[in-house]
Amino acid sequence: GKYSVIKSLGEGAFGHVYAVSDWSVNNYALKLLRLWDVPSDIRQPLIDRFDMEFKTGRITSKNLVHSYDYGFIEGNPYIVMEYCSGGDLSRLMGDSRTDVARLASDILGGLNDLHKNGKVHRDLKPENVLLQSDGTAVLTDFGISGDRNKRMTERNIFGKPYQIFGTYA
């Protein structure tokens, strides 16, 4: 194909992320949605969310991971996106040398750019904040991002009850 897998970067419930390169030796991250693991009745909603994730990644921002390509491998959709060699924010937690003000500014900049484009992230956590080689923080994983202009309903609330209500049930 167009990309060669370098290594695995991680996996979620229905997807896997790989470091890949194209034939001109540019490095990217490729997120593959593994539909063979998904019950048939939720495949289309997952594909729709994946498509929305790609489109959200097309927003121009220095603090959002950029999406470059979208396609299918044997019927399974993939997104090719910016590769962030610095890992995720969780690796900096507890490090007293971390420039917290700069990270906060980057994260808030990404959230602001999402909001200016009518989006909310809805899954902000250290694992979804990646670091570029120069230390710039960028937001990623827009899979459950939503349209901030649409009314919230119980169908689009994500998380465990104790996370939503602030209790440990």
What is the predicted function of each stretch?
Residues 74-88:
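Conserved short submotifs of the Hanks-type protein kinase catalytic core
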Residues 39-58:
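AlphaC helix of the eukaryotic protein kinase fold
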Residues 70:
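Activation-segment/catalytic-loop signature of the eukaryotic protein kinase fold
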Residues 103-104:
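Activation segment signature within eukaryotic-like protein kinase domains
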Residues 109-119:
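Protein kinase catalytic-loop region centered on the HRD/HxD motif
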Residues 88-97:
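AlphaC helix of the protein kinase catalytic domain
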Residues 16:
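Conserved N-lobe ATP-binding subsite of Hanks-type protein kinase domains
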